[in-house]
Structures are given as C-alpha cells and as structure tokens.
Amino acid sequence: MKQPAPTTRRVVVVTGASAGIGAALARVFAAHGHELVLIARRENKLDALADDIAAQGRPRPLVLAIDLSQPDAGARIKAELAAHGLEPEYIVNNAGFGLVGEATQLDHTEQLAMIDLNIRSLTELSLAFADTLARLRGGLLNVSSVAGFIPGPGMAVYYASKAYVLSFSEALHHELARRGVRVSVLCPGPVPTEFQARAGIPRVPFPRTGLPRVVGSNALTCTAEEVAEAGYEGLMRGRRVVVPGVANKAVTIITRL
C-alpha cells in the first residue's frame, strides 16, 4: 500500500527575534495568523516571547537558540526545520549588531564577527531558502537601516554592512520577482532598543561632518512596533524598499539625489 506523502507546515522564520525590532516583527506576523520559528542566541528571551504569543491564542513558535555568526548556522536551521516538518513561507532576516568607534581602533575580531552576522548569515539564509520561497510563493524581508544610504564615520563597518543589505535586497527584489517571491528591505531610522545599548549609542558622529550628533531625535525615531507594522505591510504589498517615518524617508530621498 502506498504511504501518503508527509505533510509540512508553512512558517515564518524570524532571526534576531529575542528583542527589539525582531520581537516586534514576530508579534506582527503572529497577529496576522502566521506560525513562527524564532531564532537568536538567548533561549530564555525566545521562550518568553514564544510563551507570550501562545498566550494570545496563537500556535507556540518553535524556538531555536542558534548563533547565526557561526559557519554551521544555516545548515543547523535547515536541519531543524526539516526535523519538525516545517517549510519557510517567509524569511525575516533581522539579526545584526553594531559597534561605535573608529574602525582602525575597534577590535578587528568583533568587526569581522559583525560582518559574519550582518552580511554572511543574511546572504546565506536568503539564498538557501530561495527555491522554497518560490515554490510557496512566499517572501523575504531583510532588515537594513537608513544607515545603508550613507557612509558612517564612527560606525564604518556597521554602515557598510547595512549598505550591502540594501543593495543585495534591492537586486533580489528584481531577480526573484519573476519567480513569484516578494523581497522587501526594511530601513528604519533610530529605534530605542537593546541594539543601541550594545552598540554604544546614543552618541555617534554625524556621517557628513564627523561632528557628534545625538541619534534618536523625535523627528527620526520610530518605535519597534511602528517599524514592524511598516515592514509587514511593505512586504505584503511587494514594496522594494520600506522606510518608516516621514523624516526618515526624506533623508533617504536626499541621499539618492
């Protein structure tokens, strides 16, 4: 007797989901009825978020405590999804971190780890699941920043990594469109989250003059929840670049003139 084909469940994979924009994105996708896989290093934070989502009457997300800067991270994620009978309909690449200081003075190993997480891991997951996203007619949301539009003395490697994410994602938007995959790049301005504390913000040099300037003015700042809502809506509408906030949009337009 022929055995029935195994069934799989469609999920949204969210990296960097332990706090900030990543956690907010997870909540937004869950609120719209998507089942989730949450990935970050801090398992306790992921478990707390998963419990909270389940308490809202949604399926409890699968929690994967994985360091995405490690070379085997992509293979581990694919293996875990397969073992649980899950297929990613959407990938949200949010994991990343920044460091404040002159590039020549900061620890080189830490900066290379930043490149591994902000660039290599994002690229690996974007490409590794492209065929699945195409088959499921899903989407890819990569998180960049308004920093991706300008050079950033004082955060040189971080700004450069976000410029890569912006350029790479815009190219994928066109390459994968013919295969039915929506690709959007989310470019928030300053957001008061744990990310800023880790990076040593709020004071960084202003990119064009090198003069100190406070990051997080009321005109540019959005909440993590506002950013997440804009990212979800932009992805579902197939927008190439999503910049939350009128002031932030103005900044990005000016830099491209």
Regions found by a protein language model. Give the residues of each.
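Conserved NAD(P)H cofactor-binding loop of Rossmann-fold oxidoreductase domains
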Residues: 94-99
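Active-site helix of classical SDR
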Residues: 126, 161
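Residue(s) in the substrate-gating loop at a strand-loop-helix junction
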Residues: 145
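Conserved glycine-rich Rossmann-like NAD(P)H-binding loop of the short-chain dehydrogenase/reductase
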Residues: 32-49
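SDR active-site lid
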Residues: 174-250
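Substrate-binding pocket helix/loop in short-chain dehydrogenase/reductase
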Residues: 102-115
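Conserved glycine-rich cofactor-binding loop
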Residues: 18-19
